[in-house]
């Protein structure tokens, strides 16, 4: 993936303001609510019986933070995203058997959450840069599947 200087600045500039715990928990929580079939990977997370139970679940929040911390690694290594996610791709494919479509869904939910948390700062240009990023991350995570 080729990144312009402007795209890199937009991504790193906004990411520096992201509360990884809050945004990560909200992103994973929304994924589990909006796409309930994804819950099958998280049955061991406890109460996932309702939208409120999922959003308030401390294990969902903690794992969301972990997911977004990992996503932050992509931002630190924009020029080597595939290499950055090689081991996670292998884990999700060979051990966890996660449908790679879920990576795209999670990225799209992240875009929505970022837009909600950052309002006017999440300009169309910032949105475009982050859309490119989540697409690159999803593709990298799905790499072992191909």
UniProtKB/Swiss-Prot annotation:
<keyword id="KW-0349">Heme</keyword>
<dbReference type="InterPro" id="IPR000971">
    <property type="entry name" value="Globin"/>
</dbReference>
<dbReference type="GO" id="GO:0072562">
    <property type="term" value="C:blood microparticle"/>
</dbReference>
<dbReference type="GO" id="GO:0005833">
    <property type="term" value="C:hemoglobin complex"/>
</dbReference>
<keyword id="KW-0479">Metal-binding</keyword>
<dbReference type="GO" id="GO:0004601">
    <property type="term" value="F:peroxidase activity"/>
</dbReference>
<feature type="binding site" description="proximal binding residue">
    <location>
        <position position="92"/>
    </location>
    <ligand>
        <name>heme b</name>
    </ligand>
</feature>
<dbReference type="InterPro" id="IPR009050">
    <property type="entry name" value="Globin-like_sf"/>
</dbReference>
<comment type="similarity">
    <text>Belongs to the globin family.</text>
</comment>
<dbReference type="GO" id="GO:0005344">
    <property type="term" value="F:oxygen carrier activity"/>
</dbReference>
<keyword id="KW-0813">Transport</keyword>
<comment type="function">
    <text>Involved in oxygen transport from the lung to the various peripheral tissues.</text>
</comment>
<keyword id="KW-0561">Oxygen transport</keyword>
<dbReference type="GO" id="GO:0043177">
    <property type="term" value="F:organic acid binding"/>
</dbReference>
<protein>
    <recommendedName>
        <fullName>Hemoglobin subunit beta</fullName>
    </recommendedName>
</protein>
<comment type="subunit">
    <text>Heterotetramer of two alpha chains and two beta chains.</text>
</comment>
<feature type="domain" description="Globin">
    <location>
        <begin position="2"/>
        <end position="146"/>
    </location>
</feature>
<dbReference type="InterPro" id="IPR050056">
    <property type="entry name" value="Hemoglobin_oxygen_transport"/>
</dbReference>
<dbReference type="GO" id="GO:0019825">
    <property type="term" value="F:oxygen binding"/>
</dbReference>
<dbReference type="GO" id="GO:0046872">
    <property type="term" value="F:metal ion binding"/>
</dbReference>
<dbReference type="GO" id="GO:0020037">
    <property type="term" value="F:heme binding"/>
</dbReference>
<dbReference type="Pfam" id="PF00042">
    <property type="entry name" value="Globin"/>
</dbReference>
<dbReference type="GO" id="GO:0031720">
    <property type="term" value="F:haptoglobin binding"/>
</dbReference>
<dbReference type="GO" id="GO:0042744">
    <property type="term" value="P:hydrogen peroxide catabolic process"/>
</dbReference>
<dbReference type="InterPro" id="IPR002337">
    <property type="entry name" value="Hemoglobin_b"/>
</dbReference>
<keyword id="KW-0408">Iron</keyword>
<feature type="binding site" description="distal binding residue">
    <location>
        <position position="63"/>
    </location>
    <ligand>
        <name>heme b</name>
    </ligand>
</feature>
<dbReference type="GO" id="GO:0031838">
    <property type="term" value="C:haptoglobin-hemoglobin complex"/>
</dbReference>
<dbReference type="InterPro" id="IPR012292">
    <property type="entry name" value="Globin/Proto"/>
</dbReference>
């Amino acid at each position: 993936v080729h990144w312009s200087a402007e795209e890199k600045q937009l991504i790193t500039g906004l990411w520096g303001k992201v509360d990884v715990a809050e945004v990560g928990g909200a992103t994973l929580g929304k994924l589990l609510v909006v796409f309930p079939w994804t819950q099958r990977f998280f049955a061991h997370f406890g109460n996932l019986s309702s939208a409120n139970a999922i959003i308030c679940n401390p294990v969902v929040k903690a794992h969301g933070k972990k997911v977004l911390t990992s996503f932050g690694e992509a931002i630190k290594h924009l020029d080597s995203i595939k290499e950055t996610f090689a081991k996670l791709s292998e884990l999700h494919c060979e051990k966890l058997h996660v449908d790679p479509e879920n990576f795209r869904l999670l990225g799209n939910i992240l875009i929505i959450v970022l837009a909600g948390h950052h309002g006017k700062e999440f300009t169309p240009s910032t949105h475009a840069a982050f859309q490119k990023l989540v697409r690159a991350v999803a593709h990298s995570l799905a790499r072992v599947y191909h």
